[in-house]
Amino acid sequence: MGCCYSSENEDSDQDREERKLLLDPSSTPTKALNGAEPNYHSLPSARTDEQALLSSILAKTASNIIDVSAADSQGMEQHEYMDRARQYSTRLAVLSSSLTHWKKLPPLPSLTSQPHQVLASEPIPFSDLQQVSRIAAYAYSALSQIRVDAKEELVVQFGIP
């Protein structure tokens, strides 16, 4: 019938062929979708090279994928967990010892020895913030109005013959 969840027992040859191609991409199709025999000799070599390159990329990607859903979390015993944890910690120790340039950097400056008290204190009143902003604006205005007037020449020529 036409329902979303209905199942039909009789499949057409084309449906079976499509399922076969989807399930097994390495199988070569015996018929094209229109029923004609495929002509492999008419394909240009660039197309086959591109297809081979794409197939190799797909194979590399498939070999690098870890199927997390297929991993059995119950199959590992505690001593295996401990061995892996020890192995990871030794790898991290080797990597951290090779990163000596990180150790040479100075630590961040500390403005206070008790930052939790500074963060827990009362916030600065808004009037104080406005006053600081106003003073900064006055200072900027005063600095921008400074002018240098040239009264005489900067380099004086002496009468040397």
UniProtKB/Swiss-Prot annotation:
The modification Phosphoserine is found at residues 27, 42, 56, 98, 141. Disruption phenotype: Embryos die at egg cylinder stage due to growth retardation, associated with altered endosomes and lysosomes organizations and impaired membrane protein transport in the visceral endoderm. GO terms for cellular component: FNIP-folliculin RagC/D GAP; late endosome membrane; lysosomal membrane; lysosome; membrane raft; Ragulator complex. The lineage of its organism: Eukaryota, Metazoa, Chordata, Craniata, Vertebrata. One of its GO terms (molecular function) is GTPase binding. PANTHER family: RAGULATOR COMPLEX PROTEIN LAMTOR1. The modification Phosphothreonine is found at residue 28. Part of the Ragulator complex composed of LAMTOR1, LAMTOR2, LAMTOR3, LAMTOR4 and LAMTOR5. LAMTOR4 and LAMTOR5 form a heterodimer that interacts, through LAMTOR1, with a LAMTOR2, LAMTOR3 heterodimer. Interacts with LAMTOR2 and LAMTOR3; the interaction is direct. The Ragulator complex interacts with both the mTORC1 complex and heterodimers constituted of the Rag GTPases RagA/RRAGA, RagB/RRAGB, RagC/RRAGC and RagD/RRAGD; regulated by amino acid availability. The Ragulator complex interacts with SLC38A9; the probable amino acid sensor. It is a lipid-anchor. This is Ragulator complex protein LAMTOR1.
